[in-house]
Amino acid sequence: MKNYEDKVKHKCSALLKLICGIQEFYFSANSEQKRFIETTIGAAIWYLPKNNKVLFTGKISLDAIKKNEKSEDHLFPRKIAATELLNFNWNKESDPEKVLVELFLSKYGKFNYVSKFENKKLIKYQKSEVFKTPEIAYSNAGITLVDFKK
């Protein structure tokens, strides 16, 4: 576990440099540039180290159980996560790297299992214009989550 957290910390250190390095430009960028920056930071979040024991919420959809398929769905879409991170005031944090690691491990890296069909269905409810919370997105998509029993 310690080794995993070290890997996350190492990558988050680099990600934080990217975020802080682009923030000033991001705030004055036009909407097309902002979307590009958000997509790029979102992709970087995707490449942070995975560990199912740490990041899996323990929830699976009824449809995924019925179809016997597991597709990972992150509670917070990458673009939403990127936007939040780009708008975060990192200067007020005494240990911004630790904050970013914690945000990834407790929020942005977390995922449930859903069916492939549900994963596609969720897309329209996870767009930045409509996304409010993971619970609302799942409810709007008609997805019921239950505890995963191996």
Give the ranges of each region predicted by the language model.
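Short runs of predominantly hydrophobic/aromatic residues within well-ordered alpha helices
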Residues: I37-E38, E72, Y108-F111
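A general structural signal for short secondary-structure junctions and capping/turn motifs
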Residues: E102-K107, E135-A137
